Amino acid sequence: MYYGFDVGGTKIEFGAFNEKLERVATERIPTQTEDYSLLVNDIASLIAKYDAEFGVEGKVGLGIPGMEDAETGALLTSNVPAAKGQFLRKDLEAKIGRSVKIDNDANCFALSEAWDEELKDSPSVLGLILGTGFGGGLVFDGKVFSGYSHVAGELGHSRLPIDAWFHLGEKAPLLECGCGNKGCIDNYLSGRGFELLYAHYYGQEKKAIDIIKANEAGDADAVEHVDRFMELLAICFANLFTCFDPHVVALGGGLSNFALIYDELPKRLPKHLLSVARVPRIIKAKHGDSGGVRGAAFLNIK
């Protein structure tokens, strides 16, 4: 039995999956935001509850909005303040008496998609989230690639490539990122970035959904903005694809619902890729909000 926990800022979602990777249990509880010991106890209590229900000790995986320090194991997270700087994996292991896997929630999203029935035989799957932020994860042969320092999936904190700057023009905004650097693609390719760029160029704040509707209605500013954004996506994605050369790319987050992306990217990508490079298959993620808990559970698949 595989247990997955999607530990978010306001709630923890639990899911249990059998050996066929079918979900057989679901539970949601509020996230303890201040008391770390209660946070650990809440997770341990759910594990004990479902161990008793299924009569087995489930294999435990946690997905978190952050990462472990590769040297100390301390948790780097701002969205779960009770766990910031704490040794969540080690403390939970001591509490329940078994090993625990932990990874970034974007990596869990990618892993969930990679283990979808349709994609599980794909040698490499790149999961990209175009939501409030931009991030992702890379899965090789069914395993997350986290890298030397556990930051391999922090794609949103790579910088805009030079051709993207030229594409945005001389009035391009140099946006400051929450990580302390400037020019991180998180601030440009995310749903938030889609809105920020529109406000920057047209002096008017609009929600992404309203910009998309205006584009479909033929509004000149929205059409120009969407065209500029699609090319920006193609440039930045081409840089990522040149690094990773994935077989399949699964898109999640709010902007992944923008159907035009799946028409435009395959047409725009080739001119930004090496001449011998093939455009990967680009699809909308299948598992949506359940991807985090699925991927967390599947961290234990060998």
UniProtKB/Swiss-Prot annotation:
The keyword tRNA processing does not apply. It catalyses: N-acetyl-D-glucosamine + ATP = N-acetyl-D-glucosamine 6-phosphate + ADP + H(+). Keywords: ATP-binding, Carbohydrate metabolism, Kinase, Metal-binding, Nucleotide-binding, Transferase, Zinc. Pathway: Cell wall biogenesis; peptidoglycan recycling. It holds the Pfam family ROK. Its EC number is 2.7.1.59. GO terms for biological process: N-acetylglucosamine metabolic process; peptidoglycan turnover. Zn(2+) binds at H157, C177, C179, C184. InterPro entries: ATPase_NBD, N-acetyl-D-glucosamine_kinase, ROK, ROK_cs. GO terms for molecular function: ATP binding; N-acetylglucosamine kinase activity; zinc ion binding. Disulfide bonds: none annotated. The keyword Zinc applies. ATP binds at residues 4-11, 133-140. Belongs to the ROK (NagC/XylR) family. NagK subfamily. Catalyzes the phosphorylation of N-acetyl-D-glucosamine (GlcNAc) derived from cell-wall degradation, yielding GlcNAc-6-P. PANTHER family: N-ACETYL-D-GLUCOSAMINE KINASE, ROK (REPRESSOR, ORF, KINASE) FAMILY. This is N-acetyl-D-glucosamine kinase.
